[in-house]
Regions:
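Short, acidic, Ser/Thr-enriched surface-loop or helix-capping motifs
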Residues: 55-56
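Active-site beta-loop-alpha junctions of metal-dependent nucleic acid enzymes
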Residues: 43-46, 63-87
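Mobile-element integrase/transposase regions
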Residues: 1-51
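Polytopic alpha-helical membrane proteins, predominantly small-molecule transporters/carriers
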Residues: 60, 89-90, 123-124
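Conserved, well-structured core segments that form or line functional sites
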Residues: 70, 86, 90-92, 97, ...
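C-terminal domain-tail junction helix/linker
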Residues: 148-195
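RNase H-like two-metal-ion nuclease catalytic core shared by retroviral integrases
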Residues: 95-97, 102-105, 111, 120-144, ...
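Short small-residue beta-strand/loop micro-motif enriched in glycine and branched aliphatics
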Residues: 60-64, 148
Length: 195
């Protein structure tokens, strides 16, 4: 049968091997405990991408321009490099079903610490971006500095890092008007004291 003009073509379920769906994510990963991250890409019209990692409790954001675009293997190495210093605090990472996140098992392996539970990458349901709402909201704030129609090649790596720095120093109501950077490192200090 012919599809009426403007009606959406049904999409196939994402083909990401060994993916763990968001309903399997522990209830504690609700944004109230430290160490639960969300991950996303913002992409320009030219195929360039910026990786965005966000710690849910504190709103602490990390960003990096990806010179290889949306390729899964190099992206997984970048995620591991960016989170490696914080791996003992990691609990979960939630993302969408983009093929760029297909190497999620490489992320888990790269962040593994013997004797501790592995960090699991959970995948949101299709068309449910609200299931990773914290990173979607930060993406809107990022667009204040990097407008939608811009070419990411026009922005230096230093500029991207400075955008993250500005966002991490911006006071947030949910943090009692503290900022994400202060709260993120306060949580790390508390963890060190408890150890």
């Amino acid at each position: 049968r012919r599809r009426p003009k403007g009606e959406r073509q049904p999409t196939k379920a994402p083909n990401i091997p060994n993916r763990t769906s968001i309903p399997d994510r522990p209830a504690e990963a609700d944004g109230k405990r430290f160490g639960d991250f969300e991950m996303d890409l913002i992409v320009d019209a030219y195929g360039h991408a910026i990786l965005v990692l966000l710690e849910r409790m504190t709103g602490f954001v990390m960003m990096e321009k990806l010179p290889y675009g949306k390729r899964a293997k190099p992206l997984s190495k970048t995620v591991v490099r960016m989170l490696y210093a914080y791996r003992k605090y990691l609990k979960t990472i939630t993302t969408d079903n983009g093929s760029e996140f297909a190497a999620h098992l490489d992320i888990t392996a790269g962040l593994r610490i013997k004797g501790l539970d592995d960090v699991t990458v959970y995948f949101a349901d299709s068309y449910c971006s609200w299931q990773k709402g914290a990173v979607e909201n930060i993406n809107k704030l990022i667009r204040q500095y990097i407008p939608k129609k811009s070419n990411f090649n026009d922005f230096t790596d230093l500029y991207i890092k400075n955008v993250a720095k500005k966002l991490n120093l911006r006071p947030r109501k949910k943090l009692g008007f503290s900022n994400p950077k202060t709260e993120f490192f306060k949580q790390i200090a508390n963890f060190a004291l408890a150890s």
